[in-house]
Amino acid sequence: MKLTRLAIAALLALAPMAHASDLISFWDTPQHGGNSFNQAVPDEAYFRALKATGATWVRLTPSKWKGAGRDFLIGDADHYTGIPPSDLATLITCLDAAQAAGIKVVLVPLSLPGDRWSQQNGDKQDDRLWNDKAYWDQSAAFWHDLALALKDHPALAGYNLINEPTPEKGMDLDEHADAATRQAWYAKYKGTTHDLPAFYEQVIAAVRSVDPTTPVMVDGGWYANAWSFSYWPTKLSDDKVLYAFHMYEPYEATSSPNLKRDPQLRYPGATSWLAGQNVTWDKTVVADYLAKPFEWAAAHGVPNNRMVDAEFGCVRQWVDCGAYLNDVLDTLNAHHAHWAFYGFREDGWDAMDYELAPSVTQGQFYYLQEQGKADQLKRTPHPLMDVIEAHMK
């Protein structure tokens, strides 16, 4: 059902109206937070628990929540016609809970029209958004409607327009290519449906037509690869943009399949293919790798306080997860960057719940979740969370 302006106005009455005149100032100093990718709608207790870690913000996706249609908020990613009012009401209730807990929210959808999240699409890549600009128009319409509905909510600190876009996928660009290769690729595809900066310009214009103040966060391409901004010839035209990247490299070591290796890939010491050569990962390589987005920012007049590592992490049962987290966080804090760890008390996946005690097995996690006894999960000691909290101070 299409959300009319009258319906939006009625729902806005549910949200507090006090709103900062210039929200970008929140991001003038380093902000540290966590990701919320839960299937259940987080409540105030959840946000208070996150705030207790030292977090000041949460990167929140509502895309896993059950909605009125197939795709929460969008209704149907095959054809967007308006935000279902009941979905919007649920989201506003969640934002109210975050506000009550004193934590700021950046909203991020996992799906857009023509780009349904693969885990809700039979594990199949949906790349219609990057092949048909009709879906650009629908995505802009969606964000116009959402910004119109939420622009005055005091919990909001930003709109992250899409999580981990992949306009380069299947288009002859290696995910780990060097800057020159990426730039040559973009020169070929600039102005096409694979032009991510142009897509963002269109969507931001739609947002700004109704909301001139809420910051916009944009992920780089290739799943927000930290090197993806290297092909952007300029920063975006809007002056309230945060540029986001994610950090899971070397993925072969930080991800779940490594737990099945005997022996596990270690850190430092794991190797991977990067920019045409095999590298051995240690703190120096982490620092060099993460320097790339900041080098791009400096070259294009973007200050470090507009750069965000919006996701990073490693599976908690990896023997070297703590050492890896420490080196990533040392590097990010040296740049005075914003960051958000992945993830906080995710209810459908235990692998990056750093509060869980090392003794908690995957089987115990899923059993207690299924029995509705998640509150019985042992959350101390939590040496990995200690690493994260130490870097928040």
Model-found features: residue ranges?
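Gram-negative bacterial Sec-dependent N-terminal signal peptides
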Residues: 2-19
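Active-site mouth of glycoside hydrolases
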Residues: 21-215, 220-230, 240, 348, ...
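A non-catalytic, amphipathic alpha-helix used as a structural packing/dimerization or gating element
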Residues: 53, 138-141, 288, 292, ...
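Short beta-strand segments enriched in hydrophobic/aromatic residues
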Residues: 62-64, 109, 247, 314, ...
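Short, hinge-like loop/turn segments at secondary-structure boundaries
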Residues: 76-77, 123-126, 176-177, 233-237, ...
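Glycoside hydrolase catalytic-domain groove-lining segments
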Residues: 193-198, 202-205, 213-217, 221-315, ...
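Aromatic-rich peripheral "rim/lid" segments of glycoside hydrolase catalytic domains that contact
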Residues: 319-393
